[in-house]
Amino acid sequence: VIKREHLPIQIIHIVEIFSVAIMSTKHSKAAEKFLQDSKMAAWHNETLWMVRAKRDKMSKEVPEWEELRNKACELKLYSNSHLEELLLEFEKNATANGAIVHWAKDADEYCAIVYEILNEHNVHHFIKSKSMLAEECGLNPFLMERGIDVVESDLGERILQLMHLEPSHIVLPAIHIKREQVGELFEKEMGTEKGNFDPTYLTHAARKNLRHLFLNAEAAMTGANFAVASTGDIVVCTNEGNADMGTSYPKLNIAAFGMEKIVPDLDALGVFTRLLARSATGQPVTTYTSHYRRPREGGEYHIIIVDNGRSALLSKPDHIKTLNCIRCGACMNTCPVYRRSGGYSYTYFIPGPIGINLGMAHAPEKYYDNLSACSLCMSCSDVCPVKVDLAEQIYKWRQDLDGLGKANTGKKIMSGGMKFLMERPALFNAALWAAPVVNGLPRFMKYNDLDDWGKGRELPEFASESFNEMWKKNKVQGKEESK
């Protein structure tokens, strides 16, 4: 048949099949580890679904919710198509306000600029609020290697810093940590009462511990939820007020943002602030929405605008909407895969649907294995407040895998085999006739490293007769006949 049909023959070493199969299941293996603690996995799933439910309740209380989503998407697409114009306008206004604006093309340049500023001012104690950009660029380890003490002031981030862990969620960084673990950590680090796991007590202990760190900081840093071109404002949204506390004492303050955070004006900002907290945590608005415009009297205010691969996305029409993201985390809260596998099962530092897309945009050869962590249920696309077509983009990235040389060899062989059979009815029917033999095979033959599909699923029993065979034997009856 192969000779007659002039079908291509590909020679593949068995080691290649095994290696690709193994590489393609990094997420599955990490998720398996997460699921070993069934109680924690169930709690993680239920907690995030509760946040999703709060988001739904809040969105239904705003009659113009869909109109806001459409407007936000339009504003983001406008901003992303006018980035140079808006960023230069921001620089002009921020400079007029007294800020010093820097541009960083990549993570290395960003880290170097921050260090240069701190080093010039002889800073050794540095406090910062939550910034996913700092995580993206590896700022903390970069500074600490050079003798600068970095303190995270966000409570969740501070807990993780003391535990030497990375965030597992972009809004709820310590969502995977139980209060009992926090109590034990604070007992060790802060001398709290043994066995006291009361959240209020632990929060007060953290507040007391952070107070002297705020007062003794020589410089402070914030990220940015938004940067307003028309005013030169940096806008930071928090529930703890830690960004305001951090910037209130030191004379030296730094803000940094990825260039996609730019919005045209304050009217546009109002659209996003109505969507952000409702989508992220189910609140009408964050407790604090702070505008930073100019340096303190006698101080300096530095603003760093970072590219780090963002401009490259502008040349990818299928994926440009990724730049719409406002980092609300709603896609993670709704994603059935993320909720049941945890943030550490992904290889990119941002997990969930948006992390899959950002990782592929940043380095597809490195992060392609995350593409398997999606069921294409489309829930992420449905809840995104700025209408990023997350699931559709994941599907498009999957289609690009073969061109990247990262398509799973085992799956390619299986798909090619199915195509071959389905184009030849006689062979297909013969395969169906032989299929029940699989039912009696030992498990190691059905579930192994060659079978990615079977790693998380049970193969159903093959029927002794196919529908086609039953039809030919008049065993199939319509509704009227069966009556």
Predicted regions and their residues:
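The feature marks the mature, well-folded catalytic cores of soluble enzymes
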Residues: 21-318
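Extended amphipathic alpha-helical segments enriched in small hydrophobics
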Residues: 328-332, 377
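Ferredoxin-type iron-sulfur electron-transfer modules in oxidoreductases and energy-metabolism complexes
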Residues: 288, 296-322, 338-444
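Intrinsic disorder at enzyme termini
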Residues: 27, 40-47, 414, 420-483
